[in-house]
């Protein structure tokens, strides 16, 4: 009953605070665990908000989705700032327990990959890293095969009298989105007449906020990893900083960036 509820019970603090299980006796390992567990909690909330935004936009309720999208970008800012905390760990601190991590890596975060899928950055090759976790794999497959945030945003363009090719509206959503000159032209009309298309204009800018924040997070990730391990390979088998740096050019909403050159 509500009158019996306590702060600790409501937040399941006993379970939450016992979930940090360092494998070594090194002081800094707890920070490493807390940073990554906190990231996963924030990703859970981000996925919750993106799911709401997807539902609202797909149903034509674009303006109510702004709040969810704004909340996501605020959370992204907090996640980016958290790299500064991890950066207090020196190379010696990290190397003192790195071997205990084995092949575990943030590269294997299914929630981060689900977020990429829901934004429109689809890549089926990541599914193979989650075959031993059926629930995580099912979540990823659902996100992969469903329309992304960008797909439902593009679908709003014809509802406002803008021309979009059928191939952009009815496609295999599990495949990587290929930028379209026609889609860019439609968004360009929105940006050239924001008063007329205010709802779409605001939606587009909210999406760019998300993309901007994601790239900023990636960039800070690269710098933090380089500061701590330099050019060493990542624990997950990637080439570490080299792989992370290669992701900096990714854009979830490509035409919303490219159109700016033509304004």
UniProtKB/Swiss-Prot annotation:
Catalytic activity: L-tryptophan + O2 = N-formyl-L-kynurenine
Cofactor(s) listed: heme
UniProt cross-references to Pfam families, sorted A to Z: Trp_dioxygenase
Binding site for substrate: 32-36, 94, 98, 235
InterPro entries: Trp/Indoleamine_2_3_dOase-like, Trp_2_3_dOase
Family: Belongs to the tryptophan 2,3-dioxygenase family.
Record's function text: Heme-dependent dioxygenase that catalyzes the oxidative cleavage of the L-tryptophan (L-Trp) pyrrole ring and converts L-tryptophan to N-formyl-L-kynurenine. Catalyzes the oxidative cleavage of the indole moiety.
Designated name of the protein: Tryptophan 2,3-dioxygenase
Species assigned in the record: Caulobacter vibrioides (strain ATCC 19089 / CIP 103742 / CB 15)
């Amino acid at each position: 009953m509500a009158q019996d509820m306590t702060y600790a019970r409501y937040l399941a603090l006993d379970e939450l605070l016992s979930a940090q299980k360092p494998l070594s006796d090194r002081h800094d390992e707890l920070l490493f665990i807390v940073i990554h567990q906190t990231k996963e909690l924030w990703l859970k909330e981000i996925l919750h908000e993106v799911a709401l935004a997807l539902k609202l936009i797909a149903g034509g309720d674009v303006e109510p989705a702004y709040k969810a999208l704004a909340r996501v970008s605020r959370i992204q800012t907090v996640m980016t700032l958290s790299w500064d905390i991890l950066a207090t760990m020196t190379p010696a601190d990290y190397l003192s327990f790195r071997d205990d991590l084995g092949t575990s890596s943030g590269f294997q975060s299914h929630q981060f990959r689900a977020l990429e899928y829901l934004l429109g950055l689809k890549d089926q090759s990541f599914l193979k890293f989650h075959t031993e976790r059926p629930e995580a794999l099912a979540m990823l497959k659902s996100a992969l095969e469903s329309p992304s945030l960008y797909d439902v945003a593009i679908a709003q363009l014809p509802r406002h009298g803008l021309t979009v090719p059928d191939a952009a509206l009815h496609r295999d959503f599990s495949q990587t989105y290929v930028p379209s000159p026609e889609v860019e032209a439609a968004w360009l009309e929105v940006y050239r007449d924001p008063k007329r298309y205010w709802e779409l204009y605001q939606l587009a800018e909210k999406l760019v906020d998300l993309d901007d924040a994601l790239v900023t997070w990636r960039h800070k990730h690269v710098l933090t990893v380089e500061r701590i391990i330099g050019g060493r390979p990542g624990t997950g088998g990637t080439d570490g900083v080299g792989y992370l740096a290669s992701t900096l050019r990714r854009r979830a909403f490509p035409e919303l960036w490219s159109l700016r050159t033509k304004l």
